[in-house]
Amino acid sequence: MKVIKTAPLIPSEIKVLEKEGNRVKISLAPFEFGYAVTLAHPIRRLLLLSSVGYAPVGLKIEGVHHEFDSLRGVTEDVSLFIMNLKNIRFIAKALVGQDSSLENQSVVVDYSFKGPMELRARDLNSDHIEIVNPEMPLATINEDAQLNFSLIIYKGMGYVPSENTRELMPEGYMPLDGSFTPIKNVVYEIENVLVEGDPNYEKIIFDIETDGQIDPYKAFLSAVKVMSKQLGVFGERPIANTEYSGDYAQRDDAKDLSAKIESMNLSARCFNCLDKIGIKYVGELVLMSEEELKGVKNMGKKSYDEIAEKLNDLGYPVGTELSPEQRESLKKRLEKLEDKGGND
């Protein structure tokens, strides 16, 4: 029998459908019609943006002064060494379990290797560090050569460009971009379910994969907890009758838009395509129309689709309509970044 409700149905079922390695499929139900996508999308965004991981943000190599130096007795130059280092996923054992509300949680580790040897991620395992992708290559050290370096590994979330970590670095350390998120992929599906013979209810199925720094189910629970805390503030505090200007909203969005395109983790082909035309920041892509992006030299369908997907994940689909004020504010911000050489 149909009824006229005065309150939405509260979901009562959460199931782990599959669990294999660093991947999990979770089912949540039942939801009122339209509620599933309303909740699934922000949870997905929070998984990507607020999941806590570990990354090296400072590097000191004996005998090296900047990232364009060569490494004596090592096949790779410093730039390639750094690129390989960024592909390695760390767990800083001393920081596991510490209160995530504490800022600037870090650990310093020192390494010394003598050639000849093929240095791989597993060689960085120690009493303080656990490597979750041990087979990743790092460097080729030639005979009679020695490689001494130190890392500063931070606990954090999201992506932090090197410009923002420069002031944290002790003398002699090169700042690195920090890609902290341990989430490799998260997608969801919405399905209809029967509740007392009524098919107009929904179920969310999340498919979550991490890089091994965190269990995927724990990552899901953590994202839900973050969402609950963010929304809970409205029930705990009176909402002031304050008018917010457009500039305030634009400043709030600007964190994503002023990030470098490296933060999007694009394929090399895709990145080079944008780099050749001087695109440095996410905001520059947001300002481009669909036709402009497709018209970029060597921009094939595969590259376009990749960029479109990444922008959509950030909440700025290709061709996002901005008000004249927003476009002007964003352009000025990007010009300011260029004038400062990328430092904001």
Curated annotation (Swiss-Prot):
Top-level EC class as recorded in UniProt: transferase
Per UniProt, the keywords (alphabetical) are: DNA-directed RNA polymerase, Nucleotidyltransferase, Transcription, Transferase
GO CC, sorted alphabetically, is: cytoplasm; DNA-directed RNA polymerase complex
Q: Which GO terms describe its molecular function?
A: DNA binding; DNA-directed RNA polymerase activity; protein dimerization activity
The EC number(s) this enzyme carries: 2.7.7.6
Q: Is Acetylation tagged as a keyword?
A: no
Region Alpha N-terminal domain (alpha-NTD): what ranges?
1-238
Presence of keyword Amino-acid biosynthesis: no
* Annotated InterPro entries: DNA-dir_RNA_pol_insert (IPR011262), DNA-dir_RNA_pol_RpoA/D/Rpb3 (IPR011263), DNA-dir_RpoA (IPR011773), RBP11-like (IPR036603), RNAP_asu_C (IPR011260), RNApol_insert_sf (IPR036643)
Its domain of life reads: Bacteria
Q: What processes in GO biological process is this protein linked to?
A: DNA-templated transcription
Q: Where is this region: Alpha C-terminal domain (alpha-CTD)?
A: 254-344
Q: What is known of its domains?
A: The N-terminal domain is essential for RNAP assembly and basal transcription, whereas the C-terminal domain is involved in interaction with transcriptional regulators and with upstream promoter elements.
Q: Which family does it belong to?
A: Belongs to the RNA polymerase alpha chain family.
Assembly notes: Homodimer. The RNAP catalytic core consists of 2 alpha, 1 beta, 1 beta' and 1 omega subunit. When a sigma factor is associated with the core the holoenzyme is formed, which can initiate transcription.
Describe the function of this protein. Answer: DNA-dependent RNA polymerase catalyzes the transcription of DNA into RNA using the four ribonucleoside triphosphates as substrates.
**Protein name listed in UniProt:** DNA-directed RNA polymerase subunit alpha
What organism is the protein native to?
Helicobacter pylori (strain J99 / ATCC 700824)
Question: Source organism lineage?
Answer: Bacteria, Pseudomonadati, Campylobacterota, Epsilonproteobacteria, Campylobacterales
